[in-house]
A protein has these predicted regions:
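Carbohydrate transferase catalytic cores enriched for Leloir-type hexosyltransferases
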Residues: 1-182
Length: 182
């Protein structure tokens, strides 16, 4: 009997709508995963249905086009339904908030908690989205914090269980490198 393939979805929907920040992180993550994924594993790039070209291609990578836009007020209804259809084992949400009701494990990345420190700088839509952080932290099976400070904030301010939070610093894009001295 063949071993079961581990199906990991990476939520890349935001990359269609915004450049920089979390989109840059997500694309770097996908490039890195494309280099290490192997037999018995499949990375499913969860893209916006509007994003017709694959964000990244490679062996053991596939694309799933989703209808639910990121940060949409019905995201917590539509996205879980779409993910159920994809039969994922794990979904990684680089943009903080996973589907709270789902049939797979979830890993979230928390880049910082500036939205808690400076809520007056957020739009009404952003306030609604980031107000889900407490539920997201409780719901996630694992949490990636990009720094020790973010990990500390998650534990102290949001009540994350310390054993669920792993620090994995963000890496600079390979575009950035030391220059030769002249």
């Amino acid at each position: 009997m063949a071993a079961k393939t581990l199906r990991v979805g990476v939520d890349a929907r935001l990359t269609y709508y915004r450049e920089g920040g979390i989109s840059t992180y997500t694309m770097g993550l996908l490039r890195g995963l494309a280099q290490v994924v192997g037999e018995g594993e499949e990375i499913i790039v969860l893209q916006s249905r509007k994003d017709r070209l694959p964000r990244i291609i490679g062996p053991y990578l596939s694309v799933a086009h989703l209808w639910t836009p990121p940060h949409h007020r019905l995201e917590q209804v539509g996205l879980p339904l779409e993910l159920t259809y994809r039969r994922l084992d794990v979904v990684h949400c680089p943009d903080f908030i996973p589907p709270l009701h789902r049939r797979c494990r979830a890993v979230i990345t928390v880049h910082d908690l500036a939205f808690l420190l400076y809520p007056h700088l957020l739009t009404e839509e952003s306030q609604r989205y980031y107000s889900q952080i407490d539920q997201a932290v409780k719901s996630a099976d694992a949490i990636i914090a990009v720094s020790e400070n973010t990990r500390k904030d998650l534990v102290e301010r949001v009540g994350a269980k310390p054993e669920k939070v792993v620090v994995i610093p963000e890496a600079a894009d390979e575009l950035y490198r030391p220059l030769e001295r002249e």
